[in-house]
Amino acid sequence: TLNKVYKFDRDRRFL
């Protein structure tokens, strides 16, 4: 994921 959407992805547990 991108750094800009890192928190977004982390929040959605995409990682």
From Swiss-Prot:
Presence of keyword Secreted: yes
Keywords: Secreted
Location in or out of the cell: Secreted
Protein name: Placental protein
GO cellular component, one term: extracellular region
Naturally occurring in which organism (per UniProt): Ovis aries (Sheep)
